[in-house]
């Protein structure tokens, strides 16, 4: 029995011992082969022993390895001035905003002020670098947070002013010699006569250029000069370039008081040899800033073809050439410009000087219209009159083809005249457009009526029938015979009086089968100022825009064996100052076309369909009788004065 028990223990030991050996091998880094090591472990073979060891940055027995979070504790990483970011088996140091990682130095501060594109400071601000960031500081005299800076008026450095810059209009200290508007009006010259200009919209820095002068007058200017009532002049001398911006008083002369009104302005002398002025609107109207015409001279660049450039005491100036001298007034070279709204006559200043006119007093029939100096290709003495009957003593003369405006230019070398009074007559002729063809025809088919405005003057309105779309060939005789394929060209014209304010408007134009303009059978061509849209042959060329109105339509006949067509147009003188005269026909009409004022109706006809004989003598007689109709329009007193 004892031997059997010993044998049992021996067998048990033989079976259990290998099991303990295998189990012990699995609990240590030793392995039977390297494939049993973890992916992040290193396998070492030492004879018969295989050892697994976790790599740096990992922890475990080699068979199992886990990542070590170096960022979890401060002593396991070296990111003292940066941000630690754990990675698999290691870590990285990421610099904070405003810092840059440098090998061996870690994170160091970035200077945003020296590296392009890193700061967003305003262009005028100063960038100040700080640890990990920066700040922006506006310059002295500016307000803002540094990202936006704007100057404060009165705080700019000497010689600069707070002015808007670019499209944004930001206020920036700038040199007004580089930022100004240019005033080129020749009428600002103290030589120019009276007018009604007022500088009520002046605000900012300006430079005077052109023939009127390049700087303000420094002495009291007589009233009714510079195209204004009360001329404004600089009460004080102009500054030198080293003085920078100076303040001066601008005075206005009126009622025998050279400084009845005044305003403060600023002046600066610029390096280019010119002045700029910080002007403000005058205290009253009509006041305007005046220039000294003698200030135009100064550089040889301005010399004309009739002048030489000479040096006088170190200053270059223009001097008249001897070749252009004349010995008789009749040889004076002149320049006459006939513009749409004004007439200008100019005389050679050099030739006037050669005749002894060191000073030139030039005026028209109305002495209020005086001459002025004007420099261009040549040096001229010029004078201007409106192309109208009345102003400056201008007289209108009219014939069948042209309207002619005439005046007389007077020349003197002194204010008073004792010996010779030099007079130069001049005139400009203007063609009368559509009216020419009517007045040159022997017997045009035309209807006319007279319109009086407040009893101050008469306007004549005519209506005529033309053969062509240019309205230059009127039909002649008491009647017209046309086929239904032909086109009628109808023109109405306003003649006489001052046409600068009123335009001709056709309010209703229609056709009837009889000469009676009140015939109940009417075919409207224009109704309530607008054309009949259903008739595509109607073309309104002009209406409510000028002194004439025109339309065309294809010939037609009335139903019911009626071969005669009569045209009738109700016309109206529209005041452009207070009314909308040009029709707008896309929407609501102006008024009902049922009522037509027969005292304002022009009549034409008869127009007979070709191939039909008709007695028209009675109709023509009736039509000619209409020429004596006068239409009275009662307007307000203000309008009457304007027309008068």
UniProtKB/Swiss-Prot annotation:
It comes from Rattus norvegicus. Disulfide bonds join 34-43, 37-52, 54-65, 71-84, 79-93, 95-107, 113-127, 121-136, 138-149, 151-162, 156-173, 177-270, 198-285, 220-258, 226-290, 251-259, 300-309, 303-318, 320-350, 338-428, 369-392, 509-569, 530-585, 574-581. InterPro entries: EGF-like_Ca-bd_dom, EGF-like_dom, EGF-type_Asp/Asn_hydroxyl_site, EGF_Ca-bd_CS, EGF_dom, Growth_fac_rcpt_cys_sf, NOTCH1_EGF-like, ZP-C. A lipid is attached at residue 615 (GPI-anchor amidated serine). Residues 337-592 form the ZP domain. This is Uromodulin. Residues 151-174 are annotated as: Beta hairpin. GO terms for cellular component: apical part of cell; apical plasma membrane; basolateral plasma membrane; cell surface; ciliary membrane; cilium; endoplasmic reticulum; extracellular space. Residues 175-294 are annotated as: D10C. GO terms for biological process: antibacterial innate immune response; apoptotic process; apoptotic signaling pathway; autophagy; calcium ion homeostasis; cellular response to stress; cellular response to unfolded protein; chaperone-mediated protein folding. Residues 433-456 are annotated as: Flexible ZP-N/ZP-C linker. Residues 30-66, 67-108, 109-150, 295-326 form the EGF-like domain. Residues 589-592 are annotated as: Essential for cleavage by HPN.
């Amino acid at each position: 029995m004892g031997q059997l028990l010993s044998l049992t223990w021996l067998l048990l030991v033989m079976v259990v011992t290998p099991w303990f050996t295998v189990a012990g091998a699995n609990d240590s880094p030793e392995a039977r082969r390297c494939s049993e090591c973890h992916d992040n472990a290193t396998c070492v073979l030492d004879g018969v022993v295989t050892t697994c060891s976790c790599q740096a940055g990992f922890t475990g027995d080699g068979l199992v390895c886990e990542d070590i979070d170096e960022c979890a504790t401060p002593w396991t990483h070296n990111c003292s001035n940066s941000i630690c970011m754990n990675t698999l088996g290691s870590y990285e140091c990421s610099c904070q905003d405003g810092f840059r990682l440098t090998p061996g130095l870690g994170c160091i501060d970035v200077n945003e002020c020296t590296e392009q594109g890193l700061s967003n400071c305003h262009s005028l601000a100063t960038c100040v670098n700080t640890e990990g960031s920066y700040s922006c500081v506006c310059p002295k005299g500016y307000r803002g947070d540094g990202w936006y800076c704007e100057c404060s008026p009165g705080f700019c450095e000497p010689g600069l002013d707070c002015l808007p810059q670019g499209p944004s209009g930001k206020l920036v200290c700038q040199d007004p010699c580089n930022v100004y508007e240019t005033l080129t009006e020749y009428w600002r010259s103290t030589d120019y006569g009276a007018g009604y200009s007022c500088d009520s919209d002046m605000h900012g820095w300006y430079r005077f250029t052109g023939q009127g002068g390049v700087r303000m007058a420094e002495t009291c200017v007589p009233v009714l000069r510079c195209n204004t009532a009360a001329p404004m002049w600089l009460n004080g001398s102009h500054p030198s370039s080293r003085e920078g911006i100076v303040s001066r008083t601008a005075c206005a002369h009126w009622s025998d008081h050279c400084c009845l009104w005044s305003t403060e302005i600023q002046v600066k002398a610029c390096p280019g040899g010119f002045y700029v002025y910080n002007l403000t609107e005058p205290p009253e109207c009509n006041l305007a800033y005046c220039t000294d015409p003698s200030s135009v001279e100064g550089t040889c660049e301005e010399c004309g073809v009739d002048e030489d450039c000479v040096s006088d005491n170190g200053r270059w100036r223009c001097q008249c050439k001897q070749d252009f001298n004349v010995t008789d007034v009749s040889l004076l070279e002149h320049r006459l410009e006939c513009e749409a709204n004004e007439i200008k006559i100019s005389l050679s200043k050099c030739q006037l000087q050669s005749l002894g006119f060191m000073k030139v007093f030039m005026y028209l029939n109305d002495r209020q219209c005086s001459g002025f100096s004007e420099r261009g290709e040549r040096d001229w003495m010029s004078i201007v009159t409106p192309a109208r009957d009345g102003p400056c003593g201008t007289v209108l003369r009219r014939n069948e083809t042209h309207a002619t405006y005439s005046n007389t230019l007077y020349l003197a070398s002194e204010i008073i005249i004792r010996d010779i009074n030099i007079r130069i007559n001049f005139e400009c002729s203007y063609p009368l457009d559509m009216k020419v063809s009517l007045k040159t025809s022997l017997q045009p088919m035309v209807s006319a009526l007279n319109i009086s405005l407040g009893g101050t003057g008469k306007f004549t309105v005519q209506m005529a029938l033309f053969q062509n779309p240019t309205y230059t060939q009127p039909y002649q005789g008491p009647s017209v015979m046309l086929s239904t394929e032909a086109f009628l060209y109808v023109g109405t014209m306003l003649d006489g009086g001052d046409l600068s304010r009123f335009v001709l408007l056709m309010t209703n134009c229609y056709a009837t089968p009889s000469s009676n303009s009140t015939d109940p059978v009417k075919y409207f061509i224009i109704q309530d100022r607008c054309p009949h849209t259903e008739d595509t042959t109607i073309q309104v060329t002009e209406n409510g825009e000028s002194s004439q109105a025109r339309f065309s339509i294809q010939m037609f006949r009335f139903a019911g064996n009626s071969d005669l067509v009569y045209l009738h147009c109700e016309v109206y003188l529209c005041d452009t100052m207070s009314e909308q005269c040009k029709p707008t026909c896309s929407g609501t009409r102006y008024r009902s076309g049922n009522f037509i004022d027969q005292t304002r109706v022009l009549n034409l006809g008869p127009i007979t369909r070709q191939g039909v004989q008709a007695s028209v003598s009675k109709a023509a007689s009736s039509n000619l009788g209409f020429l004596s109709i006068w239409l009275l329009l009662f307007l307000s007193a203000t309008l009457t004065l304007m027309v008068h």
